[in-house]
Amino acid sequence: MDQRVLTAMMPYFSDEFYNPSAAYLAARRVHDDIAMARHSLAKIIGAKSAEIIITAGATESINLALNGVDGTVVTTAIEHDSVLATARARGGVVLSVNSLGQIDLESLRSAITDQVALVSVGYVNSETGMIQDIRAIADVVQGIRDDRRQRGVERPLYLHTDASQAVGVLDLNVSRLGIDLMTLNAGKCYGPKQVGLLYVRAGIRLKPLIIGGGQEMGLRSGTENVTGIIGFAKAMELAESTRGSEVKRLTALRNQLKSYLVQHIPDIKINENQRRNSPAVLNFSVAGVDGERVVFALDERGVQVATGSACAANKGLRSHILVALGLSNAEADGSIRVSMGRFTTSEDIEAASQLIVEVISEQRKFGVMDA
């Protein structure tokens, strides 16, 4: 967590520890502070305060979006487990992508039958950093929506995107993106964990997941997470205020790492979309190398990397995302995800790149891999 975020949160852990739904003056002050934080979050994405639904994180936001509609859900094979599992549980349609992580717009158009109520496509892939053209997808959805209206089809059609990985890297303006629902997560921008939001465009009616006191426009009942909301707003403000300069800095760091690895690791495969990729993520594969062993060896030497998303890696599963991109099992098993952030320096990249090469060379030399 960014220290500035923690500083903003601290008063609400102690002196301002009031229930914002209460009627007394101190509680009303906290309620007003939450309202200001909600306004700040809304302003960053070009929305209205009433369109911001605070949740306990991206997974809850995604479940609210996907389970909140009546009808079929269409998504892609490279989505986060929270999207795929929810869509499949509802009998949803899962579309393939090409090797660059892009959805085929004609396939999408064909998949959106009159029974479909929601299309959910991630903005930035969590494992590879590949960026989807959300605006182009929105245009397809709008075209089908217009066609339904002309034919008298009453079922609404919405577009949802999980933009958790896009904060501080890409434009999040909901009007320019053309989306109806958007998931964001405080923990992905140096804010507190277990707090997120779902943007719900005005006029959209969702079924609530949690019923009770009617907080969050009736969609997410329960006493508000005051510290989380305050911290989330501060984290988003910081991320957006430095977005331009940070993208340039991260791009330079990613290029530095990529250049060194390509020069020193024979047969390395960079899993990226060169035209549309987040500067904060570099994913690469080395066939014949066990990715998990590389992660453990690097961790012992002070370098923290991953084999994929934390959720999948924790289960010891092969990345469904890399398999969907067309990688072989050997390439997927030999994949490493390196993320760069606000506190990463060029010196960090120099040291990490040398250690990555060292560990992979050792594995190849001694054949250290699972049978």
Predicted regions and their residues:
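Pyridoxal 5′-phosphate
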Residues: 1-371
